[in-house]
Amino acid sequence: MIDIEVFERHLRTKWVGRDRLLLEQTDSTNNYAKTPPRDLVHGSLILANYQLKGRGQSGKSWFGDAHKNLYFSIFIKPLRTDGLFLLSLISAHSIIESIRSYHLAHPLMNQLKIKWPNDVYIGEHKIAGILTENIFHGGFLKGSVIGTGWNIDQDHFPPKL
């Protein structure tokens, strides 16, 4: 379960997460962010304790139990469109840097890696996935949503995964 007070104490950003919403459950934090009308500002953060229909690239399902994982989306308003393809890569790099910032003395920490274009692994185990979606209206970019799911305390997975 996400503790907003702990989150606020550790927040070190200028704009990401300053405007935020915590949902107990939603079908998808990305869907929530993309569904009008939403008064989202640059850096708005949508967190959920549970996603009913989380998904990844190419419509693949994101499996996770309630209160066992971290689900969130960040809404941004890019000034340009020529670097949109980098959003997933930058997000994956940020996840790795965030994990490394805890200086965990675990032998697998040196096996953190990005599996192009949108997954983070420790060794052969996927620990996070990223889904970036862009919102266009009338041919103009209105915003981008960067959704992330982290396997935190997930201890079982469906056989087909």
Task: Give the residues covered by each predicted segment.
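N-terminal lobe of the biotin/lipoate ligase/transferase fold
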Residues: 1-107, 111, 135
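A broad structural signal for short, well-ordered beta-strand segments within beta-sheet-rich domains
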Residues: 16-17, 127, 141
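A structural signal for short, well-ordered beta-strand segments
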Residues: 72-74, 118, 130-132, 146-150
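Structural motif
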Residues: 122-123
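Glycine-rich, charged/polar anion/phosphate-binding loops
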Residues: 126-136
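Short, acidic (Asp/Glu-rich) active-site segment that either coordinates a divalent metal cofactor
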Residues: 139-161
